[in-house]
Amino acid sequence: MKTLLTLISLAFIGVIAVDAKTYKLPNDDFAIASIDMPDSWKPKAVDNGIWGQSSDDAVYISVVAVGSDKGVDAEINDTIEMLNKNKVTLDDSSKKENKFKAGEFDATEYLFQGKDEDGPAAVSITLIPVKNKLLILTYWVTTAKEKEHQQEVGQIVNSLKASS
């Protein structure tokens, strides 16, 4: 597998989710970008972003905006803490770095293989520069359900665009 989000995003360029709502990142007042997330993913707004899960809980996606190195470090630490709390273990030796397009942005993905309560899992932490800030997209999937959700994930990732 070359890269998880790279393959997914390339496969579904230009496809738009019909039942999706557009969310501004980090929020409506200070938007630097937007992303569409399907209503079926029960999206939840959080400080500086949004997260949601597929209806079967096999896929988790979050996107947050940060404006400083300190913010990046804090968000990555929060992500690792969330994964640990959800009993996700990552195999550090599996780490791969990939470059791809996330919507209209250049992105750098760090992909890990690991395990969660349902068995083998993959986790991607993607850094996306936007204006003078950074979006951090976290993707966690139960490997057995990955193909089933490729289209929806591709739609979400490729819906990223800059706010005017």
Tell where the protein language model's regions lie, with residue ranges.
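Sec-dependent N-terminal signal peptides
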Residues: L4-G14
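Sec/Tat signal peptide C-region and signal peptidase I cleavage site
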Residues: V15-A20
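Conserved polar/disulfide-associated segments of primarily extracytoplasmic proteins
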Residues: D47-V123, I128-P129, L134-I136
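N-terminal "mature-domain start" segment
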Residues: K21-G49
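Short glycine-aromatic motifs
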Residues: T22, S40-W41, V88-D91, L160
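Soluble non-cytosolic domains of exported or imported proteins
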Residues: I32, D69-A74, K147-Q151
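Short coil/turn motifs at secondary-structure junctions
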Residues: K44, K115-E117, T142-A144
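Surface-exposed amphipathic alpha-helical segments
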Residues: P38-W41, I136-S164
